Amino acid sequence: MAGRVKIKQKELIDSTVKNKNVMNLFHEIIGSKGNINFSVVWPKFKKIKQSVYDYISTLSVLEKASVMQNFEDDKKLLELFVQKLWAAYEGYFKYPEIEKYEVEGQVNFNLVPQYVLEKFSQLYRIRINSELVTLILNSCAFMSKYNDYILKKDPYILTITPGLCFSPIPNFEDLNFKHLYNSDKNSQHDKDFIMFILYKLYTAALGVYNAISIPDIDVEDLENIILSSVSQIKKQIPRCKDAFNKIESSVHLLRKNFNTYYSDYVGSGYNPTIIMEQYIKDISQDSKNISPRISYQFRTIIKYYRDMIATKHQTMDPQVLNLVKHVEKKLDMLDREKN
């Protein structure tokens, strides 16, 4: 039954490709034009939200813990900081619109009002790129340098790190774990508790990082888009069979390297063309035996796209233009290697 669903899904994509500009469809799948795949993005958003909540809650537990009674000034500063984090959390993450339509953790998005989906789409990128999430990701990056020690709750980390301060939160050096841990006022139980808090803070930050790293799209849908578009275009461009076969046979590289492509996509400011750039680059690097004939066929395919755009009197998207230039540059390099 599952196989049949996949077949129907591919048939739908094939039909859609016939009736839509391929690049527009690619943009839609990626979500760069405001369209997002709710079945993928909503679970991702929930994981980010939960991990952000866990991160702030950990700091809140520390602030209220008896051990902080020994550090009155630090306690007051931490209390104010936690209040600011909770206020930011309320502003970015307390939007129960879609949650109201959940049944046993699942959402039928066909039953969610369009205005609710549109509002979530508009705010999604703002939320995951917020100062709050960025702070936690920076905190994670700092602690990841000491991954093994923190996960083992090994206090040796507070000895080997240079300086008098070990603060895992950017721009908040008042939370100094060296100062807290090394105080003569602490019992061994207090010291163990402080290391446990550091451990919980790191695992929560890792949760945010891991959730953020989840692609916003279904990779299989993207593969089907590429294969279906190639299937349509090859009928209109004769004598380029070898180049098309190379593209079709290399789709496995998309799935294999997609996590890297997606990281580049996020790092580029959500430029979807970067995925195709890296994909084509990998095809060329994986194809050391591309002949001048196949190189010529690739150029013919590129020319087809240019002519199609010119015929329709459309201005080429700068991102698409960069992609075309990148492919041509790669082909030039391959040609030079052959000579």
UniProtKB/Swiss-Prot annotation:
Record's protein name: Protein H339R
Lineage of origin: Viruses, Varidnaviria, Bamfordvirae, Nucleocytoviricota, Pokkesviricetes
- According to its UniProt record, where is this protein mainly located? host cell
Keyword Phosphoprotein, does the record have it? no
Q: Which family does it belong to?
A: Belongs to the asfivirus H339R family.
Q: What induces it?
A: Expressed in the late phase of the viral replicative cycle.
Quaternary structure annotation from Swiss-Prot or TrEMBL: Interacts with host NACA (alpha chain of nascent polypeptide-associated complex).
Q: Which organism is it from?
A: African swine fever virus (isolate Tick/South Africa/Pretoriuskop Pr4/1996)
Q: Does the keyword Phosphoprotein apply?
A: no
One Gene Ontology cellular component annotation held by this UniProt entry? host cell nucleus
> Which UniProt keywords are present, listed alphabetically?
Host cytoplasm, Host nucleus, Host-virus interaction, Late protein
Spell out the subcellular localization from the entry.
Answer: Host cytoplasm; Host nucleus
